[in-house]
């Protein structure tokens, strides 16, 4: 299963809200359809959102039929619509900046077709970069996995969250491919159940041993000595190493620290936002209260009960053992070492 696939004039998006019960695709032929798919979390995961937005931007040019001189104004509207879909995942903005830069490079183009072709090519480059980067993350991350390891992960940072292979699950895949004996504990990840619906499905399809647990069981597992390592993905990493990831990640980091268990973040350098000094400056998306009051359309709480539903939390850098990127593994002091790595790259 691929999270997304370019079909030449449309973007084929796997509707992840239907998994694992049903495999259904959306054929997005306009940038608005791509934006809706991102907002509804049909496509999710920071790298996949970035790639989808890039293709959506290209579709904005493909669907434009006005004068060439008016294209920049139209594309600004396209950029704004895509940028407002998910405020926390920085890969979205990174990909859109690349697309805007490519559009500016076409200022001497005489035909719309030439510009459209260039934008599609850049979106394809972004997707291909993600495939390559995730493999490298897996290779570097394999070094932290022992010959036998029980690994806890949260949410879904696998192939379904990226163009291919995954970040946190990419490390696990690389370890298995290296002949290591890994067993994964996947937290269900309330309220959207990405761990239960997506991570468990991915790992079972790859024949990687996995046990599903409720989110509130993690501490007990650690206390029993059943967890050797925690690996999670990221939606935005601040300059000081503070990391925004799916809600519940911070709790796992605190528990891992209390039990002396290494806690790693796996993410591409495109997820690192040096413009954001610390986690306090990362915008946190809040989602629809219905996601807590209902489970798959079934009411599980009083319909009028007030709900607080942040999609992400921030794990302080002091709780993170290392950040696994395509350039290598970065450790503390993150404010120094992240900058060094980004300058080198």
Swiss-Prot record:
Catalyzed chemical reaction(s): 5-(methylsulfanyl)-alpha-D-ribose 1-phosphate = 5-(methylsulfanyl)-D-ribulose 1-phosphate
Binding site for substrate: 44-46, 86, 194, 245-246
Molecular function in Gene Ontology: S-methyl-5-thioribose-1-phosphate isomerase activity
Top-level class of the enzyme under EC nomenclature: isomerase
Entry-linked InterPro entries: IF-2B-related, IF-M1Pi, IF_2B-like_C, Initiation_fac_2B_a/b/d, M1Pi_N, NagB/RpiA_transferase-like
GO biological process, alphabetically ordered: L-methionine salvage from methylthioadenosine
Keyword terms: Amino-acid biosynthesis, Isomerase, Methionine biosynthesis
Pathway: Amino-acid biosynthesis; L-methionine biosynthesis via salvage pathway; L-methionine from S-methyl-5-thio-alpha-D-ribose 1-phosphate: step 1/6
EC number: 5.3.1.23
Annotated site location: Transition state stabilizer: 155
Active-site residue numbers: 235 (proton donor)
Family affiliation: Belongs to the eIF-2B alpha/beta/delta subunits family. MtnA subfamily.
PANTHER family in the record: METHYLTHIORIBOSE-1-PHOSPHATE ISOMERASE
Cited function: Catalyzes the interconversion of methylthioribose-1-phosphate (MTR-1-P) into methylthioribulose-1-phosphate (MTRu-1-P).
Entry protein name: Methylthioribose-1-phosphate isomerase
Lineage: Bacteria, Bacillati, Bacillota, Clostridia, Eubacteriales
